[in-house]
Amino acid sequence: GRIVWTNLREEPVLYVNGRPHVLRLADQPLTNVEATGVTTEVVERIERALQRDLREEARQRNGHVLLHDEVALENGEYAIVPVWETVQDSDILTPRDVYERVSSEGFRVDYARVAITDEQAPVPEVFSHLEERVQRAIDTDSMCVFNCQMGRGRTTSGMVIASMIVSVREYGQLWLEQD
């Protein structure tokens, strides 16, 4: 089958050795950097700049980069620990790179990034873009997939919008006739 995959993350993210890493502020290491209302183009430009910077750091450090990871503690809290990763350029990918790689391996994925601010209703332009993506999935008999960071807010918004579109498509005429 085919997949219409929509990434709803607003935060810049890089995949390093297959694991996602996000930009964080030094004084708020457990909180994503928020850029409310940022466009997809800006997020992807930031990701490409971070990718260039991290690749340059790896060249300067003989293939090593310093990252930070979250480690769960027994009390339910998290600690931030430094981790040295050994990398090559091909190990440092943007989300778009990841999906292009998946497509190049023969998977039929129609990927798009639609940046949505977490825990806020999508603005009309974003709603329209999501409507187009869902309609494309319906028209091409594809699966519709949404992702964000945690799968609680933005992914849920995408799924609710998809459900509304499918419901109106399937039952809209019947609903109109009942009134």
Model-derived features: where do they sit?
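Cysteine-based protein phosphatase catalytic domain of the PTP/DSP
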Residues: G1-M143, V160-D179
